[in-house]
Amino acid sequence: KPSVRLSMKILAIEFSSDHRSVAVLDGGRLLAEQTVTEGRDTAAVALIESALGQAKVGRLEIECIAVGIGPGSYTGIRAAIALTQGWQLALGVKVQGVDSLEALARGEQAGGRRGEVTLAVDAQRGEFYLAKFELSDDGIRNVEPTHLAKRKEYELLLTAGRPVIGPGLGDTFPAAEHVGCLAAGRSDFVEASQLEPVYLRQLDFVKVPPQREIPPV
């Protein structure tokens, strides 16, 4: 596998919630981050251009795109994947898909939270995506993989007083900064065409391939 250089310029995209964000990193060091809360109405390309401008990094300097693949807003994640596919097609950048709940756990750990915590995302239809992580000084560890749970299981966690966080539960959302930080330490690059949103229930509609947005060189 290709090795990850500490100085690799990373563009990170996290659109799995209504708090959409884009970050530019140099290895694991954050150079710039732009966040909007308008959700799907956000002009994604403008958000990327704003982050690149703030970081003073040109499109051609980006070597890797790290994209949050959910679980979360299927529409938002598909939009982020389409952007990533366009960039790889046009500029040949490396690509990584990052679990959005893992990025959320990384953000909580970086912010000082410790111990076991359940991360929850509303999956609609009375169901929730749940995953459990252990946060420590050494990092994060997934102790219960993401699964689709009924509302009752989610409510039992709340009534039992277990720490539960996630989009819609206070001001906690996956952030592009932490998507990029996770990608900075890895070398599991993929073809952007292989990326798919984390979606644990059977699709009940026909997926139409998204139109790729190819950045001008």
Give the ranges of each region predicted by the language model.
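Oxyanion-binding and handling regions
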Residues: 4-29, 40-42, 96-217
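Surface loop/turn motifs at the tips and blade-to-blade linkers of beta-strand repeat domains
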Residues: 35-37
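Phosphate/pyrophosphate-binding loops at sites that engage ATP/ADP/AMP, CoA/4′-phosphopantetheine
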Residues: 48-64, 157-162
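Short glycine/serine- and small hydrophobic-enriched flexible loop segments
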Residues: 49-50, 85, 89, 181-185
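DPxDG-like acidic metal-binding loop motif
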Residues: 64-95
